[in-house]
Design a protein with these regions (language model features):
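A helix-coil-helix interface module used to build multimeric assemblies
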Residues: 1-155
């Protein structure tokens, strides 16, 4: 399964959104989006990249052939180059412009930053809900007397 992040802790505690966000599908589709952005920018700067090549790249962002990636990675021993090759198989007219002039860190590091940003935005939204719920709870029970504790002992009024 490539659409969910897998680990013992994640399967117990992570939300469906976070499992999908940190999945292989999201990571490698983000790589492909970055390659599309790179090709588009290079085209605008005058490199010999056609609009048809960019369009073909855009058409194949989500259809990742993981069997092809795995086979190619065993041959070249490089995850990014295995994905470049596989993307080129899906978009043959654009194969020569995928990753043009980029380093591996262009896709790996930037994809991580995009995923972390999205995760933090999600966490922020969830924290806002928690804070609102706690504020409502505190307001609702503000007049309720409670037993106080200090140093793990209940307070005794003398």
């Amino acid at each position: 399964m490539k659409n969910q992040y897998e680990s013992p802790l994640a399967s117990r505690y992570a939300s469906k959104y976070m499992l999908e966000l940190f999945s292989s599908d999201t990571r490698y589709q983000t790589w492909r989006r970055l390659w599309v952005s790179l090709a588009r920018a290079e085209r605008e700067l005058g490199l010999p990249i056609t609009g048809q090549q960019v369009a073909e790249l855009e058409e194949h962002i989500t259809d990742i052939d993981y069997d092809c990636v795995s086979k190619r990675e065993k041959e070249v021993r490089h995850d990014v180059m295995a994905h470049v090759y596989t993307y080129g198989q899906a978009a043959p007219s654009a194969a020569g412009v995928i990753h043009l002039g980029a380093t591996s860190c262009y896709v790996t590091d930037n994809a991580d930053m995009v995923i972390y940003r999205d995760a933090l935005q999600y966490i922020r939204g969830e924290l806002i809900k928690v804070i609102a719920n706690l504020a409502g709870f505190a307001d609702r029970y503000k007049a309720l007397p409670t037993l106080g504790y200090t140093h793990y002992l209940s307070l005794i009024h003398i």
